[in-house]
Amino acid sequence: YEDPAYSIIECPNLLMFGDTAVLIFSPNEEVQVRIGHIGDTGRLELSMSGYTFDGGGWQGYYAPQTLKRKADRFIQWGWMPEGARGQVPEDAPLAEREARTFDWAGVLSIPRELTLDASGRLNIVPIPELEALRGEQVQMAETTLVQDLTALPLKGLQIEFMAAFHLDPDARIEISIFRSRTGEETILRYDAGSCLLELVRASSSLDPHTAREPLSVLHPLATDGLLQLRVFLDVST
């Protein structure tokens, strides 16, 4: 497979779902997926337009690797680079440079299970085994959100958060994550008009060297206006 849009195609994963071939690769930016079949020449012939597999790239999800379990079960981990936290300048004080982050380090993402849906596109969900790690559960009754801040009864550093929102076509919602008394917060924002799901990191830390640029991905809203989110929070990256 060749793609003139990229000068680098690395860390390829070729998955076979019957006769359908799924190629996942890392082009030194957001991870991409291409779907088709292997032709008589041994090349991948696409059956649909390619698209971004994960919008994190070097800022959160790169160089994923996939293993196959029995019954065509594909499980994937991605690299969450430590450098995504930000870099300490070379001319910074020694104490700061000694505590700097390194591009080659990081952690692995939570494992994902990959399947094909009826339209032939790739479905990506956290593996169900993660549910065994759940502890205390908090449930919030259905409520109507207004423009003012609605506090959620959640505290902690390891949280699995699931929510469903019925949105108007021009609505925008924001979820403030890890709010602190000193003003730190990370915002998960969704704009129904632009279908943009965005992680806003401008105020994530008081550390001036922390990465602050937003991460975003297009996420079309369902025709009935339903937005469903499942968010895993911790302090690993």
Give residue ranges: language-model regions:
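Beta-propeller and closely related beta-sheet repeat lectin domains
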Residues: 10-13, 62-65, 112
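Hydrophobic core segments of beta-strands in well-ordered, beta-rich domains
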Residues: 1-4, 10-15, 19-27, 73-82
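Short gly/pro/ser/thr-enriched loop/turn and capping motifs at secondary-structure boundaries
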Residues: 31-32, 84
